[in-house]
Amino acid sequence: MADTADETGVAGAADTDAAAGADTDGKSGGKAGGKTGGRTGAKSDAKAGAKAGAATPRERYRAQVRAEIKEHAWKQIAEAGASALSLNAIAKQMGVSGPALYRYFAGRDELITELIRDAYRSLADAVHAAAVTGADPAGLAHVLRDWALADPHRYFLIYGTPVPGYHAPEEITGISSEIMADLLTACAALEPDAPGTPPGTPFAADLADPRDWADGHPAPPAALHRALTFWTRLHGVLSLELAGHFTGMAFDPALLYEAELDGLRAPRG
């Protein structure tokens, strides 16, 4: 009985909102129709429906509850890490039973997937916004650092230690590939003498083979290596900084990051 009451409490507001929305729409539609006439009123209703009717009150409420669940999940991750994420603990914080939340997320893994998807999408959008303005690899690297510093726990969820027992679906790989594609394009646009893989090396030959990780990007091996070098070295510096390993070492992590970028931008000599 307790579970049923909780589920009714979580979903009940959606029913109330739906009823209120229908009542309001009916009254408004009646008034508008009387003043404007059938044809004009129909056009107005169509336009309003395209905007507000895209999501029903129930759907809006469901999205609101899911957003609240994710907010509590991020707080849990900040306090104890992603491996300790618990829907039952979130339910307790929200004042409902555990089974009530399974109406919104089928389980822990689905919730983690949603958080990872949100994180990757946020970073991919930030990187792409810079890329379309012509940002070079260094510019994209600054976007990465700013994004990571804004929310370290979000960064570590996608680039830190994998969550035990969790396996991300392939759709997540697609979003992460967008980030690499923008970096590859920026690296391919650099001057030919920019740092890259010297031809004839085993790694150069390896990069010339089909590259699933690059999602079929047409960048030449030198640009591929350049992008990998940027990605691995800068993530290394960022991960150490965000984990607090530079604390007490009497240097500015931002300057170290910039020095790494300078080294990556220097021509081969």
Stretch-by-stretch model annotation:
Residues 1-63:
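N-terminal intrinsically disordered/low-complexity leader segments
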Residues 2-11, 17, 185-269:
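C-terminal peripheral helix-coil segments that are non-catalytic and often amphipathic
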Residues 51-58, 105, 109, 165, ...:
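A short, mixed-charge helix-start or loop-turn motif at secondary-structure junctions
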Residues 64, 68-75, 79, 110-130, ...:
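Alpha-helical structural segments
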Residues 68, 72, 76, 80-110:
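Helix-turn-helix
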Residues 128, 149, 153-157, 239-242, ...:
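Charged/polar positions within long, soluble alpha-helices
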Residues 138-160, 173-195:
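Helical hydrophobic small-molecule/effector-binding pocket
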Residues 159-172, 250-251:
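Short helix/strand-bridging catalytic loops that position acidic/His residues to coordinate divalent metals
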